């Protein structure tokens, strides 16, 4: 029993809030939010996607779209881990819809090739490209990971 208690204490608190409803959500950019979960404020990075930076073309539109997906909705986080910056990594669900997927499907984020595990996201990205949705309206959109290296 003592071992189990110590094991539980060793887990990062972020991992204990899986499937927890979020409150007081504030959108930082197209792939990052701040929210309260079980009374604790956390910063959340949406996994497997990369949205344009705020100073990049479509950055503001991406942030606004994410805000519309989350505003006054029941939002749940499924934790996938934590990144090197201390952000909780996870999938967001708004009224039971996968927000990470919707960001890609409507052209407001790229599939983050380096970290993508859900191959079905590429189907939605290809569809958004074919339909010239969101950032895919631009002639040659620059992926955020390329943009960051250039700046």
PLM region spans:
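Small beta-barrel nucleic-acid-binding modules, primarily SNase/OB-fold domains
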Residues: 2-151
């Amino acid at each position: 029993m003592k071992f189990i208690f110590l094991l539980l204490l060793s887990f990062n608190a972020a991992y204990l809030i899986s499937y927890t409803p979020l409150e007081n959500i504030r959108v930082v950019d197209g792939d990052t939010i701040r929210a309260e979960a079980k009374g604790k404020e956390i910063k959340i990075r949406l996994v497997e996607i990369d949205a344009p930076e705020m100073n990049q073309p479509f950055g503001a539109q991406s942030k606004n779209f994410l805000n519309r997906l989350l505003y006054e909705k029941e939002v749940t986080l499924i934790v996938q881990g934590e990144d090197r910056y201390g952000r909780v990594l996870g999938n967001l669900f708004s009224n039971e819809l996968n927000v990470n997927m919707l960001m890609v499907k409507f052209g407001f984020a790229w599939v983050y090739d380096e970290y993508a595990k859900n191959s079905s996201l590429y189907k939605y990205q290809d569809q958004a490209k074919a339909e010239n949705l969101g950032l895919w309206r631009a002639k040659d959109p620059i992926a955020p990971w390329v943009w960051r290296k250039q700046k």
